[in-house]
Swiss-Prot record:
It holds the Pfam family Pterin_4a. GO terms for molecular function: 4-alpha-hydroxytetrahydrobiopterin dehydratase activity. InterPro entries: PCD_sf, Pterin-4-alpha-carb_dehyd, Pterin_deHydtase. It comes from Shewanella pealeana (strain ATCC 700345 / ANG-SQ1). The lineage of its organism: Bacteria, Pseudomonadati, Pseudomonadota, Gammaproteobacteria, Alteromonadales. PANTHER family: PTERIN-4-ALPHA-CARBINOLAMINE DEHYDRATASE-RELATED. This is Putative pterin-4-alpha-carbinolamine dehydratase. It catalyses: (4aS,6R)-4a-hydroxy-L-erythro-5,6,7,8-tetrahydrobiopterin = (6R)-L-erythro-6,7-dihydrobiopterin + H2O.
Length: 112
């Protein structure tokens, strides 16, 4: 996870390649708490983070917003009492790019 979390996102254009099945297997192994979901034919990374209350969940959400702005890559975020569901995918390519794994690792680091 640390290796990915230290990487920088690269600009992802509409013609950027999605991760291959081999890359997916290698990258997902580095972020074992994340799952792969498919919604509307679009592969996405998703993880639920647990908190003791809503205030802590909201604080994490706000820190994640700052992280996303700094890296110019933005997740889906659902903040509820005691949990935050984070979903990463690359909108421009309608699927997964290495950036999504980088940001998932950075999100894990933020949570620690």
């Amino acid at each position: 996870m640390t290796e990915l979390a230290q990487m920088k996102c690269e600009a992802c254009q509409a013609d950027a390649p999605k991760v291959t099945d081999e890359e997916l297997a290698q990258l997902i192994a580095k972020i074992p708490d994340w799952g792969v979901e498919v919604r509307g034919g679009v592969m996405q990374l998703e993880r639920v983070y647990k908190f003791k209350n809503f205030k802590l969940a909201m604080e994490f959400t706000n820190k994640l917003a700052d992280l996303a702005e700094a890296d110019f890559h933005h997740p889906g975020i659902l903040t509820e009492w005691g949990k935050v569901t984070v979903t990463w995918w690359s909108h421009s390519i309608k699927g997964l790019h290495k950036n999504d794994f980088i940001m998932a690792a950075k999100t894990d680091t933020l949570f620690q």
